[in-house]
From Swiss-Prot:
Cofactor(s) needed for function: Fe cation
InterPro entries tied to this protein: HgmA_C (IPR046451), HgmA_N (IPR046452), Homogentis_dOase (IPR005708), Homogentis_dOase_bac (IPR022950), RmlC-like_jellyroll (IPR014710), RmlC_Cupin_sf (IPR011051)
Iron found in the keyword field: yes
A single GO molecular function term of this UniProt record: homogentisate 1,2-dioxygenase activity
Protein name: Homogentisate 1,2-dioxygenase
CC annotations in GO: cytoplasm
Subunit relationships: Hexamer; dimer of trimers.
Pfam family, one: HgmA_C
Binding site for Fe cation: H345, E351, H381
Alphabetized UniProt keyword annotations: Dioxygenase, Iron, Metal-binding, Oxidoreductase, Phenylalanine catabolism, Tyrosine catabolism
Organism of this sequence: Ralstonia pickettii (strain 12J)
EC number: 1.13.11.5
Record flagged with keyword Cytoplasm: no
């Protein structure tokens, strides 16, 4: 029996999977129930929970983490999360956390989009690990993956014990049915699923493609705004967390876990998406990138790309993040006497980029939606020859709008190491370096 239950926030109101309901705010202390009175009053773990439910806490940080950074939620579910048969190791596929398969290269790298997968490929089977650093054992670094899928996960569920998942759809919508509610996400939106939260994925459009950043380190948070002030960039109110929803199904199901870089499988006799109510501040959320409040120069020069920071995973070093998630959205460029595209750069950090739609303003061609690029530590990069010539001779007395585009970047202080699949992929563009070879010598010591 598939039970589509009503949800509640302060008041009990019915809801439908046709239109999932959300709660607004980033990192808020939420309370939501899919049956009236399912949340215990005044305590977390009563002797007997309402409706015969089990109380279970899921912790995303240490018990003793400072209150401002402590993340946990209490779940009230039909069966505890421990109810399943033992896990067995799966054969290693293309989704993993093994980043020492091949030596990393200082070359600039760029890939075409993944080809369409074989029929019947669900979201988990469609994930391909492209690169990463650090590892889940040390709880630092990230895994970078691409996915291409064409089948729903109906009787299969997944959770990631290694890190939280930042999902960036590029083509096709995703319906993320999680323990804590339903999240619908489309291209130009992102979703984050916390470490350990179980879910399955449906594909409303039949096919889907996109990117994933797997965060092994500290949870993603909003960056401090400093002198920008109290508003700007990604505003907290625009992050949406689902209301409680559950399904009460029994059958022969599979639970897949990612643990210490490898996949494991277990048989489970019921759907683990059976949380009838929950409260806390650790939960899935989504964000519409089109709502990003872009900051830029209105006088001269192109500011550092940190002005486009959406989410960060902080490290122990002040001012240095384990991962920065940055976007390059539609925006007006108004700086006068300025080379307006992103400038030439050699960076101590490493940059993995993807393109959701349109054209990236530093690359006239070759970098296409669904593709990716990697510029590792101190690898020179920047606008291609065509972009440089055009921008160097454009009229900067008039504002110009970069429109119908959305590129993004996962930036890390550690070198991003491609996997064997990525290094040997047919999608790797062997002639990427040629985009800079047409840059001409303009130097003339007799002219200033």
């Amino acid at each position: 029996m598939n039970m589509l239950a009503p949800t509640a926030k302060n008041a009990f109101t019915p809801a439908s999977l046709d239109r999932p309901a959300y709660q607004s705010g980033f990192g808020n202390e939420f309370s939501t129930e899919a049956l009236p009175g399912a949340l215990p009053h005044g305590q977390n773990s009563p002797q007997k929970a309402p409706y015969g439910l089990y109380a279970e806490q899921i912790s995303g940080t240490a018990f003793t983490a400072p209150r401002a950074h402590n993340r946990r939620s209490w779940l009230y579910r039909i069966r505890p999360g421990a109810v399943h048969l033992p896990f067995e190791a799966m054969a290693q596929g293309r989704f993993h956390s093994h980043f020492n398969e091949v030596p990393p290269s200082p070359n600039q790298l760029r890939w075409d989009p993944l080809p369409a997968p074989a029929a019947g490929t669900d979201f988990i089977d469609g994930i391909v690990t492209f690169a990463g650093n650090g590892g889940p054992d040390a709880q630092t670094g990230c895994g970078i993956h691409l996915y291409a899928a064409n089948a729903d996960m109906t009787d299969r569920f997944f959770y990631n014990a290694d890190g939280e998942l930042l999902i960036v759809p590029q083509q096709g919508r995703l319906r993320l049915l999680t323990e804590m509610g339903v999240v619908d996400v489309e291209p130009l939106e992102i979703a984050v699923i916390p470490r350990g939260v179980r879910f399955r994925v449906e594909l409303p459009d039949g096919d889907a493609r996109g990117y994933i950043c797997e965060n092994f380190g500290a949870l993603f948070r909003l960056p401090d705004l400093g002198v920008i002030g109290s508003n700007g960039l990604a505003n907290p109110r625009d992050f949406l967390t689902p209301h409680a929803w559950y399904e009460d199904r029994e059958g022969a199901f599979e639970l897949v876990a990612k643990f210490q870089g490898s996949l494991w499988t277990a048989k489970i006799g019921h759907s683990p998406l059976d949380v009838v109510a929950w409260h806390g501040n650790l939960a899935p959320y989504k964000y519409d990138l089109r709502l990003f409040n872009t900051i830029g120069s209105i006088s001269y020069d192109h500011p550092d790309p940190s002005i486009f920071l959406v989410l960060q995973s902080p490290s122990a070093t002040p001012g240095v993040d384990t991962i920065d998630f940055v976007i390059f959205p539609p925006r007006w460029l108004a700086a006068e006497n300025t080379f307006r595209p992103p400038w030439f750069h050699r960076n101590v950090a490493s940059e993995f980029m993807g393109l959701i739609q349109g054209v990236y303003d530093a690359k006239a061609e070759g970098f296409v939606p669904g593709g990716a690029s990697l510029h590792n530590c101190m690898s020179g990069h920047g606008p291609d020859a065509d972009t440089f010539e055009k921008a160097s001779n454009s009229d900067t007395t008039k504002p110009h709008k970069v429109d119908a585009t959305m590129a993004f970047m996962f930036e890390t202080p550690a070198v991003i190491r491609p996997t064997r699949f990525a290094a040997e992929s047919a999608q790797l563009q062997a002639k990427y370096f040629e985009c800079w070879q047409g840059l001409k010598k303009h130097f003339d010591p007799s002219k200033r």
